[in-house]
Amino acid sequence: MRIHILGICGTFMGGLAMLARSLGHEVTGSDANVYPPMSTLLEKQGISLIQGYDASQLEPQPDLVIVGNAMTRGNPCVEAVLERNIPYMSGPQWLHDFVLRDRWVVAVAGTHGKTTTAGMATWILEACGYKPGFVIGGVPGNFDVSARLGDSPFFVIEADEYDCAFFDKRSKFVHYCPRTLILNNLEFDHADIFDDLKAIQKQFHHLVRIVPGQGRIILPENDINLKQTLAMGCWSEQELVGEQGHWQAKKLNADASEWEVLLDGEKVGEVKWGLVGEHNMHNGLMAIAAARHVGVLPADAANALGTFINARRRLELRGEAHGVTVYDDFAHHPTAILATLAALRGKVGGTARILAVLEPRSNTMKMGICKDDLAPSLGRADEVFLLQPQHIPWQVAEVADACIQPVHWSADVDVLADMVVKAAQPGDHILVMSNGGFGGIHQKLLDGLAKKAAAAE
């Protein structure tokens, strides 16, 4: 079959392209911006890429067009597909029909921690000999791709609540038929497509409805939003994680890089790993619980996590200059910002200075939905630097006014980087947070710090 993918360079659609190629299909694709690393990865697999959406790319006519969720009516390729009656479907629908239908699917859903937890579950199964397939929204550190078919019935997927395509506005995860479902947490997010929390809970309940009776749902025992969702009806086994749940994690040191795994009060494993933070400990416990449903002993799962490497942009060390370390994180919601700062604070100790540098870039952030929660979420930073995005209906100065520590802001990335470099002292830690590239600020900071160090000599 010849498959053409519209919007191929996103992590999810690029992953589907690799799966389709592994199944023996001829695969081509296009995107508005064809760029590395995804373009390099796809071309290595023998997938031809086209820049832009000129309708001529659909000649000769493909057997199937997979339509990415960024495609809209008016796109020349979309219009040609509809006009010529070319068979088409969404990425999640294709994934269900051609990959997931006959697999034991382990799905990881929730507002935060999906990529990390899915990566952990995948690595546990891989390290324990299960050879799983996977599709993850980032490249897990233990692998060099974001998707593969695998060589067993087991398949791990990051189950995203974003919509499927212009013709299917349901959440992607309703297509994923999980037998093991992790529900990490649930908050209001994606304000560009959801009106309120209830709208998101409705989609999550669609997911809960399709877990079989012999399947298992793993969730935190203290998440009221998830409890409300399951109260709408649940027909599967549940395992609760947390203080009053079946599973607990017990920290053995301040930064949570060592912790015990407890099941019904009994110690069943111990994790010593390179990650820090209670949020990662929570993610790891979820992955261990899911792996047990598949058949992995908790002790073996805990040992496997000892060699887990997280995806990029999860408290990733980008470099050091002038005695200052620069970290990068994908955090783009107040809860994630709070957790990431707490993790870094646990790692560096209570007296080291942390400079938090934030770009409010997600659609929810830009709309100002959670702006009132930003100042409290930044509380563990000693100094805060905010980028003012253009064309948004609020000012980051409002957040600055609500912060208790010194805050600086600018609408220019270069100016903001200079402010951070000027404030940074040897021994400080800079944490950059954004779900985008932030104008290359990480390298600007490292270059500026190196110049500052040279000038001081």
PLM regions: where:
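Acidic-glycine-rich active-site phosphate/pyrophosphate-binding loop
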Residues: 251-267
